[in-house]
Amino acid sequence: MTSAEIRQSFLDFFARQGHTIVPSSSLLPDSPGLLFTNAGMNQFVPIFLGDRAPDVSKWAGARPAKDTRAADTQKCIRAGGKHNDLEDVGFDTYHHTMFEMLGNWSFGDYFKKESITWGWELITKVWGIPAKRLFATVYSPDKSKNDPSDFDQEAYDIWAGVFKKEGLDPAVHIVHGNKKDNFWMMGDTGPCGPCSEIHFNLLPSDDEVEGRKLVNAGVPRCIEIWNHVFIQFNANADGTFSPLAAKHVDTGMGFERVAGIYATTKGFKDFSRDPSNYNADVFAPLFAKIEELSKKTYNGTVPTRREGLGEQENIDIAFRVLADHARCVSCAIADNILPGNEGRNYVIRRILRRGILYGKKLNLATGFFEQLVAPVVESLGAVFPELKERQDIIRRVIRSEEESFGRTLEKGLQLFNEGAKLLLDAHPIKGQADVPGVGTITNIGGVTRFLGGKFVFRLYDTYGFPVDMTQLLATERGLAVNMVEFASEMQQQQDRSRAAQKKEVIVAATEGDNTEAAQPTKFIGYDRLTADAQVLDVVKTDKDLFLVFDQTPFYAEMGGQTGDHGVVKIDGQTFAILATVKDKAGRFLHKLAPACAADVARLNPVGKKAALGVSPLARRAISRHHSAEHLVHWALRKTLGTHVRQAGTSKTKERMRFDFTHFEALTPEQIAEVERLVNSKILSNDKVEAYETEFDKKPEGTLAFFGEKYGKIVRVVDIGGYSRELCGGTHVSTTSEIGLFKIVAEMAIAAGTRRLEAVAGQAAYDFVEEHETALKAVTHKLNAGPQDVAQKLDSLLAHQKELEKKLKAYEQKAAAGLADELAAKATARDGLKFVTATVSIDNQDALRSLGSQVLHKLGEGVVTLGAALGDRASLVVYCSPAAIKAGHQAGKIVGELSTKIGGKGGGKPDFAMGGGKDPSKLADVLKQSAPGVICSW
């Protein structure tokens, strides 16, 4: 069987058992707290939790059968967070960042008997895996460690029957496992249950006793190929476990693992070779392309260490890294996870850059990585069609990243190699020795060389060289990185950055746990701008004063939206509220002017009634910008593609800023299209609705953002049914209230991240009016209508260019004449001619050109010219070969002269430049110091 046939036979087998075959879900998980989709069961979590009825037959792209049974092959990424296999990829033959998980599920339908017997039938009867080489694990709690529940007698009995039917001893083929290996939990609370794994003995011998010893021993010759999880309990908050009303089955099988074993063992028949997932033909197109590009051959060697590797070992590691990482990055980009600087996007950037680094080890030129996309599509495009559909954008994103990182990599590698060489060449002595600027050597039970954290941080901060790349390169050379020192340097940089921003940081004055226990403020400002409230607290910091109320119509700064300002009236006295922020206890802090402190103290407002009023003009302006931002997000995704994701926002009354993932600058046409789309929706007067729903019941296509903390109940902002986002901010009621929208700037803020700045409503009107006023002034100056301005400017610029050309010709002619005059005044000595002069000239380039012309006319000699250029003196010196041979050095002459006029200079023996801050001394210094005679021109 081919890999594709193994995958298809799995799906067809379960289709025959009444399972609905569903497509793989996106690698971009629906849960914002999850980095990537990392297991087949992720998309079924709402069903397991009871938040959604089983309805898989109605899912888009499904091959329908029963709603309570499902099977699929799921793309998964495990790199970063809890599951992180990145650093192992390439060094063995079974770790991957991206892999497929084959699985079947029962939602309150069949249970252990069907799951186990069907699984056994597939792998032994359909695929032909020898039964004698298989072992099953069952849950057996270790009560000394307070493992939950009881021994899984039901699973044991089913397995015992299976093995007896094969003529095998259950006592040998069934292995007991504790909570660590054989009890699955979704979290500290919630659905859970025992699991039963199937392990495959890959030793050359099929000795059952020897095979049993290797189960869960962490050796590649006996590995788990399929896990059956039986979800039958609920873990309660008090530590107890109660039975679920509906029992479920969740299974997962590593596709590459099974396909690799099949290929290695020639159809599960020859167990003489070490297993390797990379033997699966799903990797063949990639290996073929890498061999073509590198002119090297993959031999499948596997290292037993991380340093001192042989040439072929390094080649084979690089092949595996590139094959794996190309699959991972391509699939991620196809699912709109682009390389970036934060969260999951940064993980993809790390993986791509790690791949590029290993490409350098194969001497592959910049641009090679995007050529690996085609073989990924060849091997996976049939089962994951989004790879075919988005092949062009995948290549373009990778190309942009590769070109950007290529510049970083060259400089970073050079500096790393220099530092590593200094450290490795240093002589180890007893105790500790320092290698200045690089690191230390310690001799404690052996020699350890540490790259200093400051050195590593300089690579990272100045040259953008990722620290994990430095760690990888260091390990290969037997070095370690002082990560404690690196972390300290990073913290200091962050502290400096925060200080430089001079951003107001609000710290609640309440000490200890009181802030956490404080009563959260009730926000009632979505539909009203005024309210009566009770003062609960006065909060003071070193320089700020805040009031806390039981409820408020003031929106606190969050989600990129600036806080409201307005007024509060207490006992007839009115105070201006300058800003509103929220503390970690959920209290809204209403900032007053520091000058109010005495009045507030006399008033003693705690417990008193207050009348609150938000500035309606400011709130409307902020809301316009917030709703416009949602439209911008929609328009960008429509114009550029669904890979566009929000990466940061700011909404104030003056303007909005929207940061988003994209790999290249927007063209003027794209900017115009985004602006047109937004304004078209403003004109269509679409309804803007906000409503609350359960997170798992939000409408399909609703955008949520990684890193945000969403509760069970979320707020959806829906604009016309085409833009839906989870959002807690304030908005207009209809799009027409935005009025007008204008983009004012588009720029890059980081590799893979762009920024749009825009204005809406009155701010947009003011922007247009300002530009109209400027245009009217220009048309008046040009004596032309607005439609003729461009043509008139083109004509003026062409005329200017012609005049500049004539001026340059005149200046060259004048310079040639001046050069003749200077050369004619030269003095001769010892077979050389000398010209030393101060000249009146416009710029440095003209001075250099004049000096060169004079020397050319002299033949052999020394030319020293000075000029006052603005408030600085400038010098050039030229020496001919004969002059240099006679001991004259241009660099030395310039250095001495520059020092005397308050500056510095230097250069080569034949040409040098310099200058100083005091042009008034120039003529005297030249007269006293320079060879030859002084002229002034």
From Swiss-Prot:
GO cellular component, one term: cytoplasm
Keywords: Aminoacyl-tRNA synthetase, ATP-binding, Cytoplasm, Ligase, Metal-binding, Nucleotide-binding, Protein biosynthesis, RNA-binding, tRNA-binding, Zinc
Protein name in the entry: Alanine--tRNA ligase
Location (main, coarse): cytoplasm
Domain of life where this protein originates: Bacteria
Cofactor detail note: Binds 1 zinc ion per subunit.
A GO term for molecular function: alanine-tRNA ligase activity
SUPFAM superfamilies: Class II aaRS and biotin synthetases, Putative anticodon-binding domain of alanyl-tRNA synthetase (AlaRS), ThrRS/AlaRS common domain, Translation proteins
InterPro entries, per database record: aa-tRNA-synth_II/BPL/LPL, Ala-tRNA-lgiase_IIc, Ala-tRNA-ligase_IIc_anticod-bd, Ala-tRNA-synth_IIc_core, Ala-tRNA-synth_IIc_N, Ala-tRNA_ligase, Ala_tRNA_ligase_euk/bac, DHHA1_dom
Species whose genome carries this gene: Opitutus terrae (strain DSM 11246 / JCM 15787 / PB90-1)
Pfam family name, one: tRNA-synt_2c
Cofactor list: Zn(2+)
Function comment: Catalyzes the attachment of alanine to tRNA(Ala) in a two-step reaction: alanine is first activated by ATP to form Ala-AMP and then transferred to the acceptor end of tRNA(Ala). Also edits incorrectly charged Ser-tRNA(Ala) and Gly-tRNA(Ala) via its editing domain.
UniProt keyword annotation of Zinc present: yes
Keyword NAD carried by entry: no
Domain notes: Consists of three domains; the N-terminal catalytic domain, the editing domain and the C-terminal C-Ala domain. The editing domain removes incorrectly charged amino acids, while the C-Ala domain, along with tRNA(Ala), serves as a bridge to cooperatively bring together the editing and aminoacylation centers thus stimulating deacylation of misacylated tRNAs.
EC number in record: 6.1.1.7
Intracellular or extracellular location(s): Cytoplasm
Reactions performed catalytically: tRNA(Ala) + L-alanine + ATP = L-alanyl-tRNA(Ala) + AMP + diphosphate
CDD domains reported for this sequence: AlaRS_core (cd00673)
GO BP terms in the entry: alanyl-tRNA aminoacylation
Assigned protein family: Belongs to the class-II aminoacyl-tRNA synthetase family.
